[in-house]
Design a protein with these regions (language model features):
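Cofactor-binding loop segments of dinucleotide-utilizing enzymes, especially the Rossmann-like FAD-
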Residues: 10, 40, 102, 189
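Ligand/cofactor pocket segment of small-molecule handling proteins
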Residues: 103-106, 110-150
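Glycine- and acidic-residue-enriched helix-capping/strand-helix junction motifs
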Residues: 12-20
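Amide-donor transfer/coupling interface in amidating biosynthetic enzymes
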Residues: 7, 27, 45-48, 52, ...
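A short, Lys/Arg-enriched amphipathic alpha-helix followed by its capping loop at the start of a domain
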Residues: 2, 23-33
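Glycine/Thr-rich phosphate-binding loops of Rossmann-like dinucleotide-binding domains
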Residues: 15, 65-67, 108
Length: 213
């Protein structure tokens, strides 16, 4: 029996988390019977045995790695520590991993990159350009050299993390896809994102802001 994919989510709102999960499984062509789903923002990360899974996928999050420690919630501090401990084992084994948006920031920070708001991008569409390394990468094989994505993020890697390979870029945010070793990938944009999902995220975030006000 094939090993399942492990999808780790960090979104606190059920509506956005559920939509993200549906999008990952739909566009990834992954059967839900082949997935283990963990809402890490609710329960933290359990003791994950990598031998139990085929790969790990991490979605988006409202957390910003670049925030000062004194401004981070205890929940965020716990999540970051949990992921850094998990990355120790992922990197040691070159275990298949895909981090999307916040997964990019977490992995980039772990690898030693400076994360800041210098290269944030507003919610919307953007063109992404594959590098020469990206064009020959086995995971990105078949993608056009330029393609359109949906994104929206406050922070990003200031530069390529040490020992990583840049696979895709654009002018606004130079580090759009990077790879560590052979099987560890991160994207700044949302490869699972579609118009319906982004409308849901915008509506939920707008509502949350006005409720807080």
């Amino acid at each position: 029996m094939p090993k399942p994919f492990l999808i780790l989510q960090l979104r606190p709102e059920n509506e956005t988390a559920d939509n993200e999960f549906e999008s990952i499984t739909h566009y990834g062509e992954i059967k839900k019977s082949e997935v283990v789903r963990i809402r890490a923002e609710k329960s933290g990360l359990p003791n994950i045995d990598l031998d139990d899974y085929a790969a790990i996928i991490v979605g988006g999050s409202p957390f910003n790695v670049s925030d000062k420690q004194e401004h981070k919630s205890e929940e965020q501090k716990r999540v970051e520590l949990d992921f850094y401990n998990l990355f120790d084992r992922i990197v040691e084994r070159d275990f298949p991993f895909l981090g999307c948006c916040s997964g990019n920031g977490l992995l980039g920070s772990y690898c030693g990159a400076s994360i800041s708001r210098k290269h944030g991008e507003p919610v919307g569409g953007a063109n992404i350009f594959l590098t020469e390394e990206g064009k020959s990468d086995r995971l990105l094989k078949g993608l056009p050299s330029t393609f359109r994505v949906l994104l929206g993020h406050k922070e990003a890697c200031d530069s390529l993390p040490p020992e990583c390979v840049l696979l895709a870029t654009n002018d606004a945010c130079p580090v759009q896809i990077f790879k560590l070793k052979n099987n560890i990938y991160a994207t700044q944009f949302h490869p699972e994102g579609d118009s319906e999902g982004f409308i849901i995220r915008i509506h939920v975030h707008y509502t949350c802001i006005h409720v807080q006000d």
